[in-house]
Design a protein with these regions (language model features):
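Beta-propeller and closely related beta-pinwheel folds
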Residues: 10-24, 56-82, 119, 184-190
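Repeat-based blade/solenoid architectures
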Residues: 14-22, 83, 111-112, 118-128, ...
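Short, small-residue-biased leader/transition segments that mark boundaries at the very start
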Residues: 1-5
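Short, surface-exposed linear segments at secondary-structure transitions and domain or protein termini
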Residues: 9-17, 59-63, 104-112, 177-182, ...
Length: 257
């Protein structure tokens, strides 16, 4: 299905150089805040984790969440717990997955964070994702029972490019490594595909919304998108016209509808 967006309105008093990077729900019970952390990711590859309690009280004009370099910006903010993994994806198709618990909790909000991924020249992070970890390993090997358990809770990492191509790949193919490395190929960044605009975890039964720079929005069922390995280009998901480009893609959250 498809629709166009023509009107917009302000929900926050933003300055001309500011824009919203993330919107997310908070736990309803404030006593639950201590059980969660909040992780920030910047375009230049920095990450920082704070206790969610650090942001329990925010006034109407907002508060400074993270100190940034002049050429940097926040591209993703997620709530996470120690039993989860972090995935950073870049516009050139690279990605890295590391354990959330191995990222230390920062005190205060004045730090620039630490390196999440080593970026190639002119590359930048476009997506921050959080997924449950696969803690079933024993002595570094996976038994048949381990593999069955992981397969039962399998998710897919969906990647979408600016030229309307994309694919989904099993999260099992994204190995856990140490933070700060160069990462692995998540999707091939080819002239046909263009740069990657979005990458995030989905289940087979989910649906996504894809938006273009011409104000067009299309709704797609994840099951209609081909499953492929990491080192592939994917297939056409949305047909674009002229100078039209995909600018974002998000998973539809049924709990918010």
């Amino acid at each position: 299905s498809e629709m166009c967006i023509r009107d917009r309105f302000n929900i926050l008093p933003l300055k001309s150089h500011q824009s919203i990077s993330s919107i997310m729900p908070m736990p309803e019970n404030e006593t639950d805040l201590k059980n969660y952390q909040i992780i920030f990711a910047t375009a230049q590859g920095k990450v920082r984790k704070n206790s969610l309690e650090d942001f329990s009280s925010i006034n109407a004009s907002g508060k400074i969440a993270m100190k940034l370099d002049n050429n940097d910006k926040i591209v993703g903010v997620k709530i996470c717990q120690d039993a989860q993994d972090i995935i950073l994806s870049t516009k050139f198709g690279k990605c890295i997955r590391f354990e959330a618990k191995k990222l230390r909790v920062f005190k205060g909000r004045s730090s620039k964070g630490i390196k999440g991924i080593e970026l190639a020249p002119n590359d930048q992070i476009v997506s921050l994702s959080v997924i449950d970890n696969d803690k079933t390993k024993k002595n570094g090997k996976k038994s048949k029972d381990d593999k069955s358990e992981i397969k039962a809770k399998e998710k897919f990492v969906l990647s979408i490019s600016e030229n309307g191509y994309g694919k989904k790949t099993s999260h099992i193919d994204y190995r856990v490594t140490n933070r700060g490395g160069k990462g692995i190929i998540g999707i091939v960044n080819s002239p046909r595909n263009g740069n990657i605009t979005s990458s995030f975890p989905v289940f087979e039964g989910d649906e996504i919304l894809i938006s273009t720079n011409k104000g067009r929005v299309i709704r797609v069922a994840v099951k209609e998108i081909r499953t492929a390995g990491r080192n592939t280009q994917g297939v056409r998901i949305i047909k674009l016209s002229g100078e039209e480009k995909v600018v974002s893609a998000i998973k539809i959250d049924d709990n918010l509808l």
